[in-house]
């Protein structure tokens, strides 16, 4: 099993729920931090979801008002993502919410069993 430490940036350019991180079906991930910033001058609502591939269900884990011109950590705890899972983000205010997801990817490609 190989462990890769990675960062994935995102910029919410639409009001639709957007996949900001997806895990392939041969890996799992441990999300350590979701750093977000609001580059606008007014507060913006941020909703974040985990898509559970094995249950074909989406669960909301964040509903927050990100103040104008500020930074913060959206993940208040570590998230464990299984094979095929994803993180989605949504805001009604486009082009102001940006962020970086820091995670460890545990790749099981070629693993026996």
Where are these regions (language model features)?
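Short beta-strand segments
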Residues: 44, 59-62, 97
